[in-house]
Structure formats: C-alpha cells, structure tokens
Amino acid sequence: MKKLIIAGKEFNSRLFLGTGKFNSNTVMEEAILASGCEMVTVAMKRIELDDKEDDMLKHIIHPHIQLLPNTSGVRTAEEAVFAAQMAREAFGTNWLKLEIHPDPRYLLPDSTETLKATEELVKLGFVVLPYCQADPTLCKRLEEAGAATVMPLAAPIGTNKGLQTRDFLRIIIEQASVPVVVDAGIGAPSHATEAMEMGADACLVNTAIAVAGQPVEMAIAFKEAVIAGRRAYEAGLGAVGQNLIASASSPLTSFLD
C-alpha cells in the first residue's frame, strides 16, 4: 500500500483520529495506539495551554504521531487565525486542522470564512488542513489557496450517518491535486472502506470509535477497514452496480459443447 504524503511528510496510516467523547484519557490513548494512526487531532478548547503537564496531552503525544490542533469553536476567520497562532506557540507545530462553524447546533463549516482563513494562514506559514463542505468548487479554491489537504464532510459531525455526500465526494476526489481526507459522519468501518474504495486518501474518525462499546476493538476495526478499502482502490476495484445483466465468471458454454 502506498504511503500518504501531506506537505512532504510521509504517513503509513491513512486513518486519522479525533480525541473527543472518550470516557477516559486512558481509553483514548489505547484506541489511538491500537488504530495505528499517525495523525491525531485535538480541539484547543480542551487543552490547558498554560499547563505543559496537561494530562490529556500526555496520552496523545507519541514519537510517531503528528499532533494536529484544531480550531473547533471559532466562528470567523479572524478568530481562527488567532487560535492558530496560539496553537503554534503552545504546541510547537505549524500543522492545523481548520474548523470554522458558527452554528453550534449543526457544526456545519462556514465556506466563506474557511477560504478566507486558509489564505491568511498559508501566508503565515501554516500547514492547513481545512474541514469543509463537500463542495467541489470550494475544495478547488481551498487547494488553490494553498491548503495541504481538503477535508470534506461525509455527513454532519457526530451523526454517524455515513457517506451522505458520496456523489460530491467522488467529484472532489477526481478533481483534487492534494490529498482528500473524508471527515465527519463516518459511523461504521464499512463507511470508511467505501470512502477509501472511492479513492479518498484518508479518513478521520472520532465519534464512531469513542462511543463504541469497546473503543479499542472498534479502533482496530477501522484500521483494518481503511487498509482494505485502500488496497481495493490501488488494486483497481471493478465497477459496481453499473451492469444489470448477469455475467458468469466461469461460463459452461464450451464445456457443454
């Protein structure tokens, strides 16, 4: 399986994890390690920036993991830039998951503010991974603005509804020149497999693992699902559902003749 490359950095795993909703930091850490992921995102609002010994950080920081602070909770591009600068100073990384969703009920990303913030943050030297609507035109604009990836949603955050935007995701994947990370709404390993079979470069999962009866086992299931989907894509997955006429894999014609 090919390695994933983002901003010149190689990743063996194509599964990214979020850190919210786990019932304990210990379970969160066990799930992160079991998943084999190398990219972990954490909301700045959940971290005590003045406390270098913050207990949550102790469970996230490992040598093989790229920490990806996110700006969840900000409502404007201006707030996002301010939060990003704080994150860079606090965590010593210029990698950033950009999230701007002014509506606290549905947490849908604001496209105008996201594009504006991406342009500004790239100028400031950040590696920007923007969470965005599954809008092919917007994703191209974000790419042109210098985004290191685009992260279109599959469904609203935390809903576990799967690939509700699959038709738009296909277009985004086809057009993109940067990695496409399917983010939000992935609720089952089968959803992750489908996204990877479509050609997505990675999936970001949080709720489906964190609220599972056995989060560590679910993390392993997602790890295997992402690998299976990517292998199928790289192997040249056959067209599915486009031909309604049956075709035998081992016809008996010559044998009967």
Curated annotation (Swiss-Prot):
Domain of life: Bacteria
Enzyme Commission code: 2.8.1.10
InterPro entries registered for this protein in UniProt: Aldolase_TIM, Thiazole_synthase_ThiG, ThiG
Keyword field contains Ribosomal protein: no
BP-aspect Gene Ontology terms: thiamine diphosphate biosynthetic process
Pathway(s) it belongs to: Cofactor biosynthesis; thiamine diphosphate biosynthesis
Catalytic activity: [ThiS sulfur-carrier protein]-C-terminal-Gly-aminoethanethioate + 2-iminoacetate + 1-deoxy-D-xylulose 5-phosphate = [ThiS sulfur-carrier protein]-C-terminal Gly-Gly + 2-[(2R,5Z)-2-carboxy-4-methylthiazol-5(2H)-ylidene]ethyl phosphate + 2 H2O + H(+)
GO MF annotation: an example: thiazole synthase activity
Keyword Transferase: yes
Binding site for 1-deoxy-D-xylulose 5-phosphate: G158, A184, G185, N206, T207
Localization terms from the record: Cytoplasm
Major subcellular location class: cytoplasm
Active site, per annotation: K97 (schiff-base intermediate with dxp)
Keyword set, alphabetical order: Cytoplasm, Schiff base, Thiamine biosynthesis, Transferase
One Gene Ontology term, aspect cellular component: cytoplasm
SUPFAM superfamilies: ThiG-like
Assembly and binders: Homotetramer. Forms heterodimers with either ThiH or ThiS.
Annotated HAMAP family: ThiG
Family of this protein: Belongs to the ThiG family.
Purpose: Catalyzes the rearrangement of 1-deoxy-D-xylulose 5-phosphate (DXP) to produce the thiazole phosphate moiety of thiamine. Sulfur is provided by the thiocarboxylate moiety of the carrier protein ThiS. In vitro, sulfur can be provided by H(2)S.
Protein name: Thiazole synthase
Organism: Phocaeicola vulgatus (strain ATCC 8482 / DSM 1447 / JCM 5826 / CCUG 4940 / NBRC 14291 / NCTC 11154)
Gene name in the database record: thiG
